[in-house]
């Protein structure tokens, strides 16, 4: 039972790390040329929201404190809400919970 509890606690952390790593690689922030490097600037040319005037020449930062907050707080919160939702379907006697 302890292994199941440990898995339930670590699953949101593993998903957070995996999804953060995936998107930062896809955006080009994590680059593996000769070694792992971090390029924390991205030029978003294809968006209509960003104005042409006043834009930094090397782009905007991708990996910020907000990125950490969304991934570190948002993803485990979804798992927590899912667990609460799943508890509504556990009946005593059917599943030994």
From Swiss-Prot:
Going by the entry's taxonomy, the superkingdom of the source organism is recorded as: Bacteria
Q: Which NCBIfam families match?
A: cyt_b559_beta, PRK02561.1-1
Among the GO biological process terms of this entry, one is:
photosynthetic electron transport chain
Topology versus the membrane, per the UniProt entry? Answer: Multi-pass membrane protein
Q: Which GO terms describe its molecular function?
A: heme binding
Keyword Nuclease among UniProt keywords:
no
Tell me where it resides.
Membrane
Q: Signal peptide: which range, if any?
A: none
Keyword Phosphoprotein in record: no
- Which InterPro entries does the entry mention? PSII_cyt_b559_bsu, PSII_cyt_b559_N
Protein source organism: Prochlorococcus marinus (strain NATL2A)
Q: What is the role of the protein in this entry?
A: Unknown. Resembles PsbF, one of the subunits of the photosystem II reaction center. However, it encodes asparagine rather than histidine at the site PsbF uses to bind heme.
Can you say what this protein is called? Answer: PsbF-like protein
Q: What is its main location?
A: membrane
TM helices/strands, residue ranges: 4-24, 70-90
Keywords, alphabetical? Membrane, Transmembrane, Transmembrane helix
């Amino acid at each position: 039972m302890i292994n199941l509890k440990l898995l339930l606690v670590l699953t949101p952390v593993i998903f957070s790390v995996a999804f953060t790593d995936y998107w930062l690689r896809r955006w080009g922030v994590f680059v593996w040329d000769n070694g792992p490097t971090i390029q924390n600037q991205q030029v978003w040319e294809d968006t209509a929201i960003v104005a042409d005037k006043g834009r930094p020449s090397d782009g905007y930062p991708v990996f910020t404190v907000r990125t950490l907050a969304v991934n570190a707080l948002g993803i485990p919160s979804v798992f927590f809400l899912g667990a609460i939702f799943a508890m509504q379907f556990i009946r005593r006697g059917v599943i030994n919970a």
